[in-house]
Each structure stands twice: as structure tokens, then as C-alpha cells.
């Protein structure tokens, strides 16, 4: 009994596990079986690859998911959500890049696909009581009448994925289980090896799911025409290079600028960082040193808000925020502008706060929700 759950009443509960072909979902299915649930797997295909493309991991992932389900003795269903993904995730992704922002499609995939389309299919077609995913996050299990389940950080602080799940409501959390959120990653791999699961040593997937191991610039260039332009220094406005497209760059970026070795106006040879984008002139603005003043922000404005309890914030409140994944918590104050927009003031200035990314708020272990960063302050 690896997880802290009462197993006495689980045998009548059906759980559909999102089987990705990775180690986390594999161990999630195993743990749920150990807890006595009726477990079935569901493999999602969210992206249609060209047959000509070298990158084609979906077939491999499906084979691994099937092998794990066979080993565990559970049925694996498959579903194609490629159309939903294109309409609700990928088109937004392209629109944001076209607007010079840096979106996070994984958050939108969780919102529109894994905890909406997947949940609806599991509910209506497979008659599930719960769905389960291999995310490193936890949820509370209410004990008092009227109490609602909360989204909590995962036990493994290095792998905690609550940042990607801030859009979930109490109702979605109530229908979801996160077995590996109670464990640290090495323990998950150990269980997979112990159970002789084919995914035990499989490398974690990295990057954006539909791009995989391909070069980001090549992939994006297929869908959005690149517009080369000048690279200017923030301090003197001096042209020191050319970029291949603003969409390929993000605030705080140091690598891939191809302007190394050039001294700034102060004669220093410090590394150059992207500190801003001038969309009107199609100019990439760079400064020297990661502490360049143009990289720093005292706060942000966020919109497209998703609070876990679905109630807008009406009064000023203090909490902590992350403006990117795996960032240390930043103490801050939230000031409501209206129901759709908030101003956030950091206790200390922060670097590389990036429009298009998500600001996610916490009260200790509890994820409160978040929104999309519209602008830096």
C-alpha cells in the first residue's frame, strides 16, 4: 500500500488512466490496481504526423502503453483527439507566436484535452468514476460535508506539475486521481523496474509534445512565415546582428543569438540576453548581463484567469506566484482590476517575466489558480 487511500470501497470504482507510453502513467496504473480500483487505460493521439516525417513517436508510445497494459492485465482503449487539439490548442499556439508572445501549449492541452475531452469521453463512453494521469501533483480528499477538493503540489518538488494544472476546477479535481504525485521520481522508476514494466528506463519526454525532438525553428517555420529583422542594443540602439524571426526568441534568452564576442557601449564582453521585442519595427532588443534593467519587472498584469474555485478575486491578497515552471515561489500581492484582470506586485523585482506565459498562484501547498501574463510592470 504505497498511497494513503482507504482501499475498502475502491473495488466498485472504475478509473480510466491516461496511458502515454511513459513511466509515470505506467506506474500510476499499477498503483491504482494495488489500491483495488477497476483500472482501464486510454491512449490519446493528439497530433497527426506526416508519414514522411522521421519524427513519429506516437506508434512507439502506443506500443509501449499496450505492453504495459498487457503486463498489468488491463484493457487499453485508444482515442484520436487530433481535431480537438488543432482547434483548441494548436491554433492558439500559432496565434500567440504570431503576436510575438511565448505561449505554453501544455497548460492548454491539460485544460482542453486531458481534463475536458478525455474526461468527457471517459465519463460518457467508458462510464468512469475517475480519470487518472501521471502528473506529479496531488489533490485533497474532503472529509467534511460541503468541503471541496484542492489541488496540491506534488511531493517531489523538483517534478511538481501543479503549475501546468492551474486551470482545473474543483469539479475536475474531484474526478481526477494523481497516484505518482505522492512519490518522488526515483521511487516511480524503482517501482517500474520492480514490476518489470517496459517503460522503467524510458527517457522522460521533453519540450512541446507535438514538436518532440524536432528543431523548434524548423517546425514553427512550417506554419508561420519568418520575418528576419535587426538586433539592436537596449542601451545605445546600435544594430549588432540580425534575427530570423521574433517568434523564435523569448525574454531572457541567451543562446542562439549569434552575436557573441561583441562588446557593448561600456566595453564589456558580458553575455547578451533578449530583453525586449519591438513588434512594430520587428526588432529584437538585447542587453548585456542577466541583471540588465530592461529584463527586470516589479510585477505583471494577467488576464484569462482560471481560479480553482471559479470565484473572481475581489480584494487585495498576498500569496506566492510562479511565472514559469520550476521557478522558486515569488512572494507577491494580487490587486484585482476587474473580474477578468489582475495586477500582481512582486515583493522583489524579477527577471524575464514573459507575456504569453502563465502566472500561477499558491497559498503554501495549495494551488489557487492563475492566468496569462499580458504585460510586465
Swiss-Prot record:
The record marks 135, 357 as: Interaction with tRNA. Residues 159-161, 324-325 are annotated as: Interaction with tRNA. GO terms for cellular component: cytoplasm. Keywords: ATP-binding, Cytoplasm, Disulfide bond, Nucleotide-binding, RNA-binding, Transferase, tRNA processing, tRNA-binding. Disulfide bonds join 109-209. Catalyzes the 2-thiolation of uridine at the wobble position (U34) of tRNA, leading to the formation of s(2)U34. This is tRNA-specific 2-thiouridylase MnmA. It comes from Photobacterium profundum (strain SS9).
Amino acid at each position: 500500500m504505497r498511497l494513503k487511500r482507504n482501499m475498502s470501497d475502491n473495488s466498485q470504482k472504475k478509473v480510466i488512466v491516461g496511458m502515454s507510453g511513459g513511466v509515470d502513467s505506467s506506474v500510476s496504473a499499477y498503483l491504482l490496481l494495488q489500491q483495488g480500483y477497476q483500472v482501464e487505460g486510454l491512449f490519446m493521439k493528439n497530433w497527426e504526423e506526416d508519414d514522411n516525417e522521421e519524427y513519429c513517436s506516437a506508434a512507439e508510445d502506443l506500443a509501449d502503453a499496450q505492453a504495459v497494459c498487457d503486463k498489468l492485465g488491463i484493457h487499453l482503449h485508444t482515442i484520436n483527439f487530433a481535431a480537438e487539439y488543432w482547434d483548441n490548442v494548436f491554433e492558439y499556439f500559432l496565434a500567440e507566436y504570431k503576436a510575438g508572445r511565448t505561449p505554453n501549449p501544455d497548460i492548454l492541452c491539460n485544460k482542453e484535452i486531458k481534463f475536458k475531452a478525455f474526461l468527457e469521453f471517459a465519463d460518457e463512453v467508458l462510464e468512469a468514476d475517475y480519470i487518472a494521469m501521471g502528473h506529479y501533483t496531488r489533490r485533497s480528499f474532503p472529509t467534511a460535508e460541503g468541503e471541496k477538493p484542492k489541488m496540491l503540489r506534488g511531493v517531489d518538488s523538483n517534478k511538481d506539475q501543479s503549475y501546468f494544472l492551474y486551470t482545473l476546477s474543483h469539479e475536475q479535481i474531484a474526478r481526477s486521481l494523481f497516484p505518482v504525485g505522492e512519490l518522488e521520481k526515483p521511487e516511480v522508476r524503482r517501482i517500474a523496474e520492480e514490476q518489470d514494466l517496459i517503460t522503467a528506463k524510458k527517457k522522460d519526454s521533453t519540450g512541446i509534445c507535438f514538436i518532440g525532438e524536432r528543431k523548434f525553428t524548423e517546425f514553427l517555420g512550417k506554419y508561420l512565415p519568418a520575418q528576419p529583422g535587426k538586433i539592436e542594443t537596449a542601451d545605445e540602439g546600435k544594430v549588432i546582428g540580425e534575427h530570423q524571426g521574433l517568434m523564435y526568441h523569448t525574454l531572457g534568452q541567451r543562446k542562439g543569438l549569434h552575436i557573441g564576442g561583441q562588446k557593448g557601449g561600456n566595453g564589456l564582453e558580458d553575455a547578451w540576453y533578449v530583453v525586449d521585442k519591438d513588434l512594430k519595427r520587428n526588432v529584437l532588443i538585447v542587453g548585456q548581463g542577466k541583471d540588465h534593467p530592461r529584463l527586470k519587472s516589479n510585477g505583471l498584469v494577467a488576464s484569462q484567469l482560471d481560479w480553482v474555485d471559479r470565484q473572481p478575486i475581489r480584494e487585495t491578497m498576498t500569496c506566492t506566484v510562479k511565472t514559469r515552471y520550476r521557478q522558486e515561489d515569488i512572494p507577491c500581492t494580487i490587486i484585482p482590476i476587474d473580474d477578468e484582470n489582475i495586477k500582481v506586485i512582486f515583493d522583489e523585482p524579477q527577471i524575464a517575466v514573459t507575456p504569453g506565459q502563465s502566472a500561477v498562484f499558491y497559498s503554501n501547498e495549495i494551488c489557487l489558480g492563475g492566468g496569462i501574463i499580458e504585460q510586465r510592470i
